[in-house]
From Swiss-Prot:
PANTHER family: DNA TRANSLOCASE FTSK, SPORULATION PROTEIN RELATED
Transmembrane parts of this sequence: 35-57, 62-84, 91-113, 128-150, 157-179
Known role: Essential cell division protein that coordinates cell division and chromosome segregation. The N-terminus is involved in assembly of the cell-division machinery. The C-terminus functions as a DNA motor that moves dsDNA in an ATP-dependent manner towards the difSL recombination site, which is located within the replication terminus region. Required for activation of the XerS recombinase, allowing activation of chromosome unlinking by recombination.
Name of protein: DNA translocase FtsK
A GO CC term attached to the entry: plasma membrane
Stored Gene3D superfamilies: 3.30.980.40, P-loop containing nucleotide triphosphate hydrolases (3.40.50.300), Winged helix-like DNA-binding domain superfamily/Winged helix DNA-binding domain (1.10.10.10)
Cell division found in the keyword field: yes
Cytoplasmic topology ranges: 180-816
Subunit: Homohexamer. Forms a ring that surrounds DNA.
Any one biological process term the GO annotation gives: chromosome segregation
Family: Belongs to the FtsK/SpoIIIE/SftA family.
Any one GO MF annotation of this record: DNA binding
Length: 816
């Protein structure tokens, strides 16, 4: 027992484990003591006090060379501000990278000295510093120390000393960039702004040079006119007329001419008087025509065989009241081309400055939100880049290996919620890239003006039907060539920008094409969208506003297409380009000039109205034009605000392969237009999806805005130069209110041949139903229904009353 008691007494007390606060306090004390000791040691090294201070400094020099002071300062900052620096990862990383660059630069400078050139790097560096260390001196430049030598040696071996300088500079720039608050987007934006500034300066210099050339031409022309006027006055002053006979005394005139002419004018100068015709350019001919004067609108003497008779009427006699004295001084040789000046971009309102600086901060924030949102759903992605467009910003994300694409595409609603966006469109994947695009609407939509788009587009002026359509998400202007489409369907809900886009396409063509190169046929059942273009010389006929006339006008275009194909067959060419080439070759070698064929663009602003009135005729004409009109130089632009299957039928879609979809209300409408979803997520106001014939996926564009004032200015400019010259061959003529063709859907239809028989049957049985007529007369259900409608219109039977049978309003007469 005593032994047990002694054993219990010898057992010590159980030690208590320190708390976290106590451990942290102990660590803080240790850090404080360490920092204080290092500070004292580094202080002696900084001031090089005594042998100890010099030795400390030389030890640091051995590691980092002559950058010792920089690293001493960096060490002291880290000792006392390490908590703050832990939150600044980019600052620390940038400093380390910039320090590596400085070490390379210092060592490259050291070994560019003649005394160390071509010496072994590590051994020479160590010998320099160890010599000072052993002698307790600081005498020589140490470059980047042993650390700098280790980095410099492979770089100098691979890239030489000069290459090491360049790599060091790159490291320093990269380090400073990481230390700053700048982002990659800021650098890209700066480069883009600088590029735009240089381009604007170049364009301004180009305009100034053009203005100087024009001024020189004007001065030269003025001098020529003054010189010619002086010659004429000198000639008239030298002429002596016999008062009795009225004849010119040539001998005396020749004597007086030398005295009257100015000193710089000699007898061998240019002809005394040449008639100047302002409206046309004259073609060189030897002799004037010895016939009554005629004026040619173009350089065409006779039409090509088998052309329409309308094209032969190219010559107009002068009025009888023309003064003969004026005719004697006019050269009536055929004229090459009508002097027609194309409209300039100055007719359009200048661009308004756009400020999207707020979008940059929002983009940086959205990048973090996107990555965090995907991470919360267990999807590992990385945002590769972001492109700020006029209306949306496109984020290109790269999913990790093994992530299914549909997992990302199914999160559109969740992403819209996280980004507080109106809607989000996901393009999975981006065509041609191993990335997925997420399009988020901007907080402020930047309007793209027609002038801005025209100036930035790279459309070829020789391609008359190549027009700029809009700006892509990356800000680049996109153009399309209607000749390659070859037809275009434009659809979207009311107010989405459909009519503005059509006006932009028309204005683009008017900016490039003369009236003899492109002709328009415009159909506008709404009466307000295209009526502004009335009376321009590019129109074949006035803008058609009557839907019943429109179907006949389309049939006229079909007839023109057939006529052109017959002409191509007889000439032996395949398309309009080959035909016009033949015409140019013939005109170059013959005095009789022939007429090239213009391109024809048919524009329908509201297809739904036409389909309601005369669906069969309109659909047949559109299908025939869609199948064959491309080679004949005829192209269609069909616009509608009701993208339903009864308006855009399958046959129309098959023959109009290029489509533009503006904002629609549902995915069904989007599939009707594009055969895929996406248009229901558009923002309106010109935001569109463009799907050309040669691309499998639509491209999102922001269409240009062209105001009514801009359209009126360009139309007024064109009307001031030439008047409308309508072609009667395309005139649909007058159409009665009840005339809608055989397949229309309105008006009073023609009487069915079985109408009287059906009427007698109803009066005899005093019963009226479509099934009875179908059974008794052996007709189809559709025809029986039409007969019932005719009987109702004739007052034989009453209207339908739900499930009740129709009332027979007439009774049979004894004769019946």
């Amino acid at each position: 027992m005593v032994f047990m008691a002694n054993k219990k007494k010898t057992k010590g007390k159980k030690t208590r484990r320190p708390t976290k606060a106590e451990i942290e306090r102990q660590r803080a004390i240790q850090r404080m003591i360490t920092a204080l000791v290092l500070t004292i040691i580094l202080f002696f090294g900084i001031i090089r006090l005594g042998i100890f201070g010099i030795t400390v400094y030389n030890v640091i020099r051995f590691m980092v060379g002559s950058l010792a002071y920089l690293f001493i300062a960096a060490t002291l900052i880290y000792l006392y501000f390490f908590k703050w620096l832990r939150k600044k990862d980019s600052l620390v990383a940038g400093f380390l990278i910039a320090s590596l660059g400085l070490l390379i630069e210092w060592h490259a400078y050291l070994f560019s000295m003649p005394i160390l050139k071509d010496k072994e790097i590590l051994r020479s560096t160590a010998r320099l510093i160890v010599s000072d260390l052993m002698q307790f001196k600081i005498t020589v430049f140490a470059g980047g120390g042993m650390l700098g030598a280790l980095i410099y040696k492979p770089i100098a071996f691979l890239f030489s000393n000069i290459g090491a300088y360049m790599i060091g500079v790159l490291f320093i720039i990269l380090g400073l960039f990481l230390m700053s608050s700048l982002e990659v987007y800021d650098i890209v934006e700066f480069i883009r702004a600088f590029k735009n500034k240089v381009a604007e300066k170049h364009e301004q210099n180009k305009k100034e040079r053009f203005a100087k050339r024009e001024m020189k031409k004007a001065i030269a022309e003025q001098e020529r006119i003054e010189r010619q006027k002086a010659e004429e006055e000198a000639y008239l002053a030298s002429v002596n007329v016999d008062p009795e006979t009225g004849e010119i005394l040539e001998d005396q005139a020749e004597d007086n001419l030398d005295d009257a002419l100015p000193p710089e004018v000699s007898e061998t100068s240019t002809p005394v008087f040449e008639p100047e015709i302002l409206a046309y350019e004259t073609s060189p001919q030897n002799d004037p025509l010895p016939v009554e004067p005629t004026i040619y609108l173009e350089d065409y003497d006779s039409p090509i065989p088998n052309m329409r008779e309308n094209d032969e009427e190219m010559v107009y006699d002068l009025d009888d009241d023309v003064d003969d004295s004026d005719i004697e001084n006019v050269d009536f040789t055929p004229k090459t081309t009508l002097v027609y000046k194309l409209p300039t971009i100055d007719l359009f309102a200048p661009d308004k400055p756009k400020n999207q600086s707020k979008e940059k901060d929002l983009v940086r924030k959205n990048i973090r939100v996107l990555e965090e949102t995907f991470r919360s759903f267990g999807i590992d992605v990385k945002v590769e880049r972001a492109e700020i467009g006029p209306s949306v910003t496109k984020y290109e994300i790269k999913p990790a290996v093994g992530v299914r694409v549909n997992r990302i595409s199914n999160l559109s609603d969740d992403l819209a919620l996280a980004l507080a966006a109106k809607d989000v469109r996901i393009e999975a994947p981006i065509p041609g890239k191993s990335l997925i695009g997420i399009e988020v609407p901007n907080s402020e939509i930047a309007t793209v003006s027609f002038r801005e788009l025209w100036e930035q587009s790279d459309a070829n002026p020789e391609n008359l039907l190549e027009v700029p359509l809009g700006k892509a998400v990356n800000g680049n202007a996109r153009s399309f060539n209607l000749a390659r489409m070859p037809h275009l369907l434009v659809a979207g809900s009311t107010g989405s920008g459909k009519s503005v886009a059509v006006n932009g396409i028309i204005s683009s063509i008017l900016m490039k094409a003369r009236p003899d190169q492109v002709k328009f046929m415009m159909i506008d059942p709404k009466m307000v969208e295209l009526s502004v273009y009335n009376d321009i010389p590019h129109l074949l006929i006035p803008v058609v506003t009557n839907p019943r006339k429109a179907s006949k006008a389309l049939q006229k275009v079909v007839d023109e297409m057939e006529n052109r194909y017959e002409l191509f067959s007889k000439i032996g060419v395949r398309n309009i380009a080959g035909y016009n080439t033949k015409v140019e070759e013939f005109n170059a070698s013959s005095e009789q000039k022939q007429i090239p064929l213009p391109l024809i663009v048919v524009i329908v602003d509201e297809l739904a109205d036409l389909m309601m009135v005369a669906s069969k005729e309109v659909e047949d004409a559109i299908i025939r034009l869609g199948q064959k009109a491309r080679a004949a130089g005829i192209h269609m632009i069909l616009a509608t605000q009701r993208p339903s299957v009864d308006v855009i039928s399958g046959l129309i879609k098959a023959n109009v392969p290029s489509r533009i979809a503006f904002a629609v209300s549902s995915g069904t409408d989007s599939r009707t237009i594009l055969d895929e979803n996406g248009a229901e997520k558009l923002l309106g106001r010109g935001d569109m999806l463009f799907k050309p014939i040669d691309e499998n996926h639509p491209v999102r564009l922001q269409g240009s805005f062209i105001s009514d004032d801009d359209v009126e200015r360009i139309v007024g400019f064109i009307k001031d130069q030439a008047e409308a010259d309508y072609d009667d061959a395309f005139d649909p003529g007058e159409v009665s209110e009840t005339d809608n063709g055989s397949g229309g859907g309105g008006g009073v239809p023609e009487s069915d041949p079985l109408f009287e028989e059906a009427k007698g049957l109803v009066l005899e049985t005093q019963k009226a139903s479509a099934s009875m007529i179908q059974r008794r007369l052996s007709v189809g259900f559709n025809r029986a229904t039409r007969l019932m409608e005719e009987l109702e219109a004739a007052g034989v039977i009453g209207p339908a009353e739900g499930t009740k049978p129709r009332k027979v309003l007439m009774t049979p007469t004894p004769s019946e």
